[in-house]
A protein has these predicted regions:
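C-terminal end-helix/capping segment
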Residues: 21-40, 102, 109
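Phenylalanine-focused residue identity feature
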Residues: 3-5, 68, 75, 88, ...
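Mid-chain, well-packed structural core segment of small domains
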Residues: 30-80
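Charged phosphate-binding loop/patch that engages nucleotide di/tri-phosphates or the phosphate backbone
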Residues: 80-114
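Hydrophobic/aromatic-rich, well-ordered segments within soluble, folded domains that form packed cores
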Residues: 1-25
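Short helix-capping/linker segments at secondary-structure and domain boundaries
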Residues: 10-16, 77-87
Length: 114
């Protein structure tokens, strides 16, 4: 799950979560811009969206449904392309009533401690 739908560092605590975590918004932007990584992420989000009538919990199980929400939130914020932003927001709308992951937003927009 971590390398298919990465999330922001600070959300997961396992070794795998730390290994595959995205450090910041700039790294998320580079991830999206990479033809392989960004392409695979988009393809996989489209595949999940294709499961109409099911919840993220039905499709992914727990806690991966929460990780998916975190991933969508991160990349909706990172997307500079309107079609990318629409894709991630469409998935947030379909599975989470349009509500992004609060903790991801807090971590993204918090000021670094000095």
């Amino acid at each position: 799950m971590w390398f298919v739908f990465p999330q922001l560092i600070g959300l997961g605590h396992s070794a795998m979560a730390q290994r595959y975590a995205i450090r910041d918004l700039e790294q998320a932007k580079r991830y999206l811009a990479d033809p392989i990584l960004g392409g695979r992420l988009r393809d996989n989000v489209w595949r999940i969206i294709g499961h109409k009538g099911k919840t993220a919990l039905d499709i992914l199980g727990s806690p991966d449904d929460l990780k998916f929400r975190s991933c969508l939130t991160l990349f909706a914020e990172a997307a500079s392309d309107s079609s990318d932003r629409m894709l991630f927001k469409e998935a947030l709308n379909q599975f989470y009533n349009g509500t992004p992951d609060r903790r991801t937003l807090e971590l993204l927009h918090s000021k670094p401690k000095l």
